């Protein structure tokens, strides 16, 4: 990477790292795992910077794949008790609609109930504000798969106990 490319890469990281971290935190519910996934994503981007035409799309795809792969690997390992945090982490969720301190744990708990694939689609589509086509491209699946998976995931979220009372049953009739 030459100096000009290096400056362009640094500018990209400066403008996008918070967005990537916010998506990763929503996908993982864990700040440290999210930081790690973003770091690995940016490492992969740096290695291919001169060949990547659409760095935002590349990062979305790599980040999502890393988070899904990590979740699958974690599901195969025995669970460990998390260590208590020794320092406060900055809040990457403070810049979006999850500002409500009371609502944030409920939303993260509900997202935890989804499969990694469902969660990635919901986070990219509704929290990342990407179109079905962009999510489809990021995950390498058909647009119809994104729509049907999002529909099933949202139906599951509507019935999640931590979100009880946030949805009006009359607005979402049973099928």
What residues fall within each predicted segment?
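Arg/Lys-rich amphipathic alpha helix in sigma70-family domain 2
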Residues: 64-83, 99-100
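C-terminal edge and immediately downstream basic/flexible tail or linker adjoining helix-turn-helix-like DNA-binding
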Residues: 2-3, 7-8, 154-175
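DNA-recognition helix of helix-turn-helix
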Residues: 54, 64, 68, 139-164
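C-terminal flanking helix
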Residues: 17, 21, 42, 115, ...
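Structural recognition of an alpha-helix C-terminal capping motif at a helix-to-coil junction
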Residues: 36-43, 53-65, 148
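A short pre-motif secondary-structure segment
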Residues: 121-125
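A short, charge-rich alpha-helical start-of-domain segment used by transcription regulators
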Residues: 1-22, 32-35, 50
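Short amphipathic alpha-helical boundary/capping segments
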Residues: 9-11, 106-114, 157
